Amino acid sequence: VALEPDAIPEQADLGRLETLLGGVLAENPDVSDPVYRTNVPLALLQLRKARMVSGRGGQADRLYISEALSALRRFADRERYAPEPDRLVEMAYVAGNDGTAQPYYVFLPRTYDPEREEPWPLMVFLHGYVPSISILQPWVLDVETCRIAADLGCILLIPYGRRNTDFQGVGETDVLAGIREVRELFPVDPDRIYLSGVSMGGMGTWNLALRHPGLFAAATPITGQTDMHAWWPRLLPDWPLDRDDLWPFRRMLVEWDNPIDLVRNARNQKLFVQHGENDLLIPVKQSLDMVAAAHALGIPIRVHVFPGASHYIYWDRPCFENAWGWAVQQHLDRSPAHVTYKTYSLEYDTAFWARILAFVRWGREAVLDCRVADDGVLHIDTVNVADVRIDTEPAPLPEPGPDGYAVRVNGEARSVVPSVDGSLTIAVEPGAGVVPGGDTWLPRKRKGLCGPVEEVFDGPFLVVPGTGGAGADQERVRRNAMTWIQEWDRFADGIPRIRVDSELTTAEIRAHNLVLFGGPETNSVVAAI
């Protein structure tokens, strides 16, 4: 990249910083380069902060601009940013969905050595709900609490989570992106990644662990919700007390990220939950009911209730010492003999070595139960599953016979020959419904093209206002698009990418979900559809 160190001033205003960053991005740099990844996104984040405080008075904008210039200077000098140990350090990445620079926070042990032969365990902490949270005022842990993880030998990661998202949707993608960044920039042990969180982050811990079995070696939720069917009636007086009284589509949207409905996904996961006995915000019953539901399926979950304690057990350190001290003793087992999984969307399709490839019917729960018996036969039992893939490398299967692997699918005996990569692809039952013939409707529901609408914003998307029609129509479309963009910013802390319909390219259409504003008379993309 043609950015010389002497081209970066000691001081600059917002306009000059924007010009410098624009020049870097215009050169199409290698975004996988660690020097780029540890500096340029951080400079973009500081630019965002400087814009937010510009005009408020004081020196805050100059401080953020100075930090951005320091990051650009390191980039020009080909210097990878190396966080200082024993200090909570802000880093950043560019989000794949809306293209905004987002923060995450890293705390390295005092003994951290990137050249150490043994990789480092990673502790991921999810914060609680705070109405005022922003990139200017993130919810992070104090240094002494960070040191609990560090003194246990862990790198500590605190994702931002896009404000207050329950770590679902865009918040979940932020957590996974932060984990990916840290794994690729630091020597992390993939079999010792631990997840923990408090309050809202406690529920996020349940959700991420249950949606991604096989990712975390242990999960330790603290004072988190587990059943939104019991939670919403406490807040919304018109919410039905009985889940059967919800319209089916609404019930599905509650249950697809409701921990207690995903409890079977806890099988083979190491979980330790803590709660205050007298928690008036999130009753201890939320945790105890989850533990009971797991035990009913033969799934053990460790639990500790603090006698007489309120919701805010995480204002003291014992809950962290309990959770993290226990977690670091756990290692991920990638080859359990019995795997169970429930999902409502193919965005979440994998448990350890078993993957759901297709549903029979969309909009309904799918359940997968895979078990390697003592005689080596693979038993697969399903509900609403059309196709399954088995990764035979981690699966504890014997060597295949001359006719392949012995499998029983919903009680039917089969012999399945592995594919070239060694995996097994098994057709369980055909998908239901009628698919129009010919070219009348080419797209079929598949992973990434199925909904719910939340999934539009989990992947790359563009806001596309129309530019056609009369002046008043154009102004209405523009105003509606800007209103939505501001709503997104208030929710997810970032201004998403915008492309008017007349400038949208075929390549951009292929690479993005489109959020279209206007009708056929004002938006050429809507007209084409």
Feature annotation, model-predicted:
Residues 3-120, 451:
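A domain-start/cap signature at the N-terminus of enzymes
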Residues 119-185, 462:
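Active-site machinery of serine-nucleophile hydrolases
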Residues 132-141, 217-264, 268-269:
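Mobile cap/lid helix-loop segments that gate and shape the active-site cleft of serine hydrolases
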Residues 195-197, 222, 274:
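Short beta-strand immediately N-terminal to the catalytic nucleophile in serine-hydrolase-like folds
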Residues 266, 272-275, 279:
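Short beta-strand/loop motif that positions the catalytic acidic residue
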Residues 278-280, 284-377, 384:
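C-terminal catalytic histidine-bearing segment of alpha/beta-hydrolase fold enzymes
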Residues 435-529:
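Long, folded non-catalytic interaction modules
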